[in-house]
């Protein structure tokens, strides 16, 4: 940090210059990432559960996922699970308790500001996801994963899925009490893991509910990644589904999010 000086009787008095907005945001981002990686519950959500699901589901019959080799269909779904773990469940729980203890209101009155706080949260989510993808990618490669599709399309789906679930997580955290956010975020997470079309594609469910599952953002995210990584095609329908959910989430945050 640079310092400016002012003339007073008796000499020069240093006057610290204000840090740039981006420096403040990056400092908060580093704090958010460090806090998440040191939190046992967050590590369980972001690393342990996705890794366990990856190794466990890699042994299921190909009929479960409708594709062989199984690992090629499982890995994109586990990437989707990792995104939901970080951008939705982890973000909602952390923000909910920060809101309860007045951290959001306090940070909103500092040089970081509300926009800076949201920017730091968003960047920290992306950084943690990158760590997850490296960790899971290495594990999947050990199991034989060999993606032949389009990484460019996959990145588009990942960014859109992150924005979608982050907006939904913030909406949950900004409208409910911390305890309610904790309970509902975990219930939604477990529900999506089981019946959200994440690891097992929506078209493998009974016809009566497969169409409903395909409308969920979790299914759109996982199916979009499978289309990109396996077939190398742009998942237009899944992208539109995510865009709709993202727009709804952003609208809800702008309208109902409360800082205290």
Tell what function each PLM region has.
Residues 94-126:
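Helix-loop-helix units of permease transmembrane domains in multi-pass membrane transporters
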Residues 56-64, 173-215, 219:
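Transmembrane helix segments
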Residues 27, 31-35, 105-109, 210-214, ...:
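Short amphipathic alpha-helical coupling elements at transmembrane boundaries
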Residues 196-248:
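Membrane-interfacial helix-loop-helix junctions in multi-pass membrane proteins
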Residues 114-187, 233-243, 247-250:
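Alpha-helical transmembrane segments and their short interhelical loops
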Residues 3-29, 208-218:
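Short, membrane-interfacial amphipathic segments enriched in basic
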Residues 14-24, 28-101, 129, 145-157, ...:
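Transmembrane helix-boundary elements of multi-pass transport/secretion proteins
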Residues 54-59, 137-141, 170, 219, ...:
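Transmembrane alpha-helix boundary and packing residues in multipass membrane permease domains
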